[in-house]
C-alpha cells in the first residue's frame, strides 16, 4: 500500500481567520505540539514580500523561518507556502539548506486578469516560478487552485507540464469546498495516470459542503499507484468553512491504517489556542 502522509496547515491556512496574527506563544507552542503529535509535514506560514511582524506567520526571509524551526524533529519535514499571484521574489529566496524549510508549496492559478482586464493564461508564469523554486534546491508541491476550472484535457496538460519539474507532489485543490468526492476522485485519477509514480498526489479540501472528511476517506481507499499527502488543520481552522480536521483524520488513520499520530497534542492546541480564535471569528458550515 502506498504511504499516506499528513500535512498540518494550521499556522498557514488558519491565518486567513486572524490575518496570521497568532502571537509568538501560540506559534511556538503550536509548532511544538504538532511535532509531538507526529504529523509528517508541518507548514509554518506564508513567504511574502511584505514587512515582517513578530508573532505573525508571514515571513519575508528564510532566516525568519529558520528561527522558528530551530532544531528539526527527526523524520518531520517543514514547509512554507508561496503564491504566484503575490510572489516572493526568487532573488530574495536563499538556497535550501538543512536548517531551513524542506518544502515550498506554490499556489498556481489557471488564469489571471491582465492590465486591460482581460483573462489570460497564468500557468506558464506559475511554471517558471516553480522552476525557480526547484533550482534553489527546495522540494516543490504544486497547488493548482480551483481544479473545478479545468476540463479533463486542461488538467492533464497542466499535470504533465508541472511533472517536468519533478516536484514532490501535485495537488488536487478544492478551493471553495464545492466539489463532491466523485468529482475530486476524477481529478485524482487523471493525475495518477499522467504523472511518474514517484510524484506524490495531494489533497487540499475545504468543508463548505461538510465533505472534507468523507472525501479524504474515499481517497484513502482508492488504489493509487503513488504516495498521498492529506492537508488538515486543528479543528479545521481555515478560510471559509474551514479545512479537513487534523484530529479527526489523524484518529481515523490511526485506527484504519495503523499510523501512530498522537491526538492529545492536537486537542491541546484546540483547547489552549484555537478555541479562543474560533470564539472571536468562527468558521464552518
Kindly give the residue locations of the regions a language model identified:
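Catalytic cores and adjacent flexible loops of soluble metabolic enzymes
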Residues: 1-285
